[in-house]
Amino acid sequence: DGTWTYFAGDIAYHSNKISRKFDMLINILGADHAGYTKRIVSATKAISENRVNLICKVSQLVKLFKNGEPFKMSKRKGDYITVEDLIKEVGKDSTRFMMLNRSNDVELDFDFKKVTEKSKDNPVFYVQYAYARINSIFRLLKLNLNAKIKFDNKKFTLNQYEIEILKKISEWPRCVEISSNKLEPHRIPFYLYDLATLFHSYWNLGKDNISYRFISDNKPTSTTKLIILKC
């Protein structure tokens, strides 16, 4: 009947990208558009003569919960929450972290209460709290977190928990590389949560055993721990 379709407009949109010399295109689609991917990928190959690679990432739905109950949205009734509303409620950092904290092919339950509570169950708080604890040590010692720390290699010793933390830290470059190559950003918050868990566990050991505390009268040991914290 002459009515424009989404497909026609999208072909023109992708053609414009190709004309701007992009050789890889990425589309992020909702789960309800999963069946659309083959058509647009085929169209992109045709108009680019197979020169351009179009990757379609299908994201599952985000379910919102308030006070433990599902928040049912309806455009017709005017009951809905925008991204702007979400950011105002919990903050942009929490919103970004939680949205990335699941693979795109897995549904996400976004609980307002959980995202704002101060507990291990809130990954945003748990990771930020690790950073806050590290900074508190440097403030207490009146040291600049970015300053170089002098140490004696011969006196540089590590216990099993410190070795475990350093092993995890050494995985960071590889984690970033895989996340980029596979287009899987959820690997980043997963990694940060695991690293924060190791740090908090080690911190808690110091409550009962002074040899595990980050600040002590043993200067070589304290220096070793400060270097780990800088990492």
Where are the predicted features?
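Non-catalytic interaction-recognition regions
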Residues: 1-231
